[in-house]
Amino acid sequence: MKNTLNGKWVFDSNLLIYGLDKSSSRYHDVYHLFELGKEGKIQIIVAQQNIIETVHAFVKGYKSPIEEVIYNIKGLLDELDIYIITPINKTHSIFFEILSNSSDPSDIFDYYLAATMLDNGINRILTINTKDFSKIPGIEAVNPFN
């Protein structure tokens, strides 16, 4: 995989899940992205929401023990020195604006993630669900596997 990425990127929950699931067909691709972060070639950012969604996927979907999930996610965050963004006092206002300007709101949670990103001055996200973010002004969504 050739690196054409640089700078700050939010990693969507799907990438975190693939990167923690060694049986995933995307595991090695995401691992390469993690390596770029470790090497300082990109800055990996996640929102608190991504952490919650990843925990949910492993506990409810994979039926993994909560202790194992916490250990693995904390280890990933620490090992890669991942920067974590959070909603701020007015994130809901941007969320409502995005939502009200959408003709067909597809994924409410992605809209809230986009609002959190914009409030933190970040507009780029790596995700396999680019269509969910492509309708949101100010957000650049890239599928790293294309």
Provide a role label for each language-model segment.
Residues 20, 58, 137:
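Short, flexible helix/strand-to-coil boundary loops that buttress conserved ligand/catalytic motifs
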Residues 56-85:
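Helix-adjacent hinge/juxtasegments
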